[in-house]
A protein has these predicted regions:
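Feature responds to low-complexity, polar/acidic, surface-exposed segments characteristic
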Residues: 17-30, 43, 127-173, 180-208, ...
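Short strand-edge motifs at loop-to-beta-strand transitions and within beta-strands
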Residues: 92, 124-126
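Structural motif
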Residues: 47-70
Length: 378
């Protein structure tokens, strides 16, 4: 059997199974997002495969299926709306009678109570016609402190010696700068501050604005001695706490790691593990007191804002991608480092090779390197 025939057969099989699966109900109190700090992108992905219904794959930023997502299609010509609920595989099955161009919106509950997910208001229009059968939409957390999910600007800078130092330790000031760069311009403006609450963060320090802004936003805290210790290496626990404060929720559940029971950052670490942002090691440990490396910071930040590049994502613009001599393409962090250090335009691609097992994997496909990105080195 030819490879293309196998793929068609596999996709047809999963669609038939998915149509029979029950859908998960959205909580009664779920409401659409009211701020524009979330993202949804709908892109044609599989051509020439004819199936009985249009299929919209709904995915959370953590790459998990958005089971129970409520999808609203608004006809751009008539204004009429229809709603569809994604099944446990994250598949919303849409009748083929709905021909036209639609604005797509989706909402769902997250894996932790109190966290809602939504697509970006005014997402890329979805065109339903005889040629398109399979599309996708990505949902992100609705946060009070908005992150820039849409613009894939570089947020990490290399060193003067030409290296990026993926295995080097990263300081508290440096991760504050990274989180500052990942904020939307509106968020940075809302929390803008240069008034330091810390004795060791001077007005002339290169990181003053970043640290003061994050402090005002409630993402960072200092030490009992009144200092921030900006040049100290940040631990995995400390960085987890900074990120988890974005979600403004507490999580009391099963401990995810062997070595975090009773740790001061246990709740923060569990939140990030539940959301797929923090990964443990092969022994089931989070290593909370270990210094964070630059590669680990890049990987966590990419998961935080839903950036999902692989080694082949940037193939179409490989000649213009900035590489690093110490970022080997065989390293586990290779794509994460390139994602963090290259500003780029992109589309989404979906991998349906493992669709029968419910493993729809959404990855980026870079289209060009951006030249309009902020210059964080200034």
């Amino acid at each position: 059997m030819k490879k293309s025939t196998k793929l068609i057969s596999l996709l047809l099989a999963v669609m038939m199974i998915a149509a029979l699966l029950p859908t998960a109900a959205l909580a009664d109190n779920a409401e659409p997002a009211s701020v524009g700090d979330t993202i949804g992108g709908v892109v044609d992905t599989v051509k020439g495969i004819k199936i009985p219904t249009y299929v919209l794959y709904c995915s959370l930023m953590s790459k998990l299926p958005a089971s129970g997502a409520v999808v609203t299609l608004t006809n751009n010509l008539t204004g009429e709306t229809t709603t569809h609920t994604a099944n446990m595989l994250g598949l919303a099955l849409i009748p083929k009678s709905l021909i036209g161009v639609y604005t797509v919106a989706a909402t769902c509950d997250g894996p932790i109570s109190g966290i809602k997910y939504s697509s970006l208001p005014g997402a890329t229009p979805m065109t339903l016609n005889a040629k398109v059968d399979f599309d996708k939409i990505v949902l992100f957390p609705v946060l009070n402190i908005g992150l820039n999910y849409t613009d894939h600007f570089a947020y990490m800078i290399g060193f003067p010696n030409g290296n990026v130092g993926p295995n080097a330790k990263i300081t508290r000031a440096e991760v504050a700068a990274i989180l500052y760069r990942l904020m939307t311009p509106k968020t940075r403006a809302n929390y803008a501050s240069t008034t330091s609450p810390f004795k060791d963060v001077s007005a002339s320090a290169w990181y003053n604005t970043e640290v003061c802004t994050l402090y005002k936003a409630g993402l960072i805290k200092g030490f009992p001695d009144g200092n921030f210790h900006p040049n100290a290496n940040v631990t995995r626990a400390e960085f987890s706490a900074m990120i988890a404060r974005l979600f403004s929720v507490s999580y009391v559940g099963n401990n995810n790691f062997e070595d975090t029971n009773g740790h001061w950052a246990q709740s923060y670490i569990n939140i990030l593990a539940k959301l797929g942002i923090l990964k443990g090691d092969a022994n089931g440990n989070a290593n909370p007191n270990d210094p964070l490396t630059r590669a680990q910071a890049a990987a966590m930040c990419n998961r935080l804002v839903g950036r999902n590049s692989t080694g082949s994502s940037m193939s179409s613009c490989s000649g213009t991608v900035k590489g690093w001599p110490d970022n080997a393409n065989s390293a586990w962090y290779y794509a994460d480092i390139l994602e963090a250090t290259n500003s780029h335009n992109y589309t989404w691609a979906v991998d349906v090779k493992n669709a029968l097992g419910g493993d729809f994997v959404i990855t980026e496909k870079w289209t060009s390197i951006r030249t309009d990105a902020p210059d964080w080195a200034k």
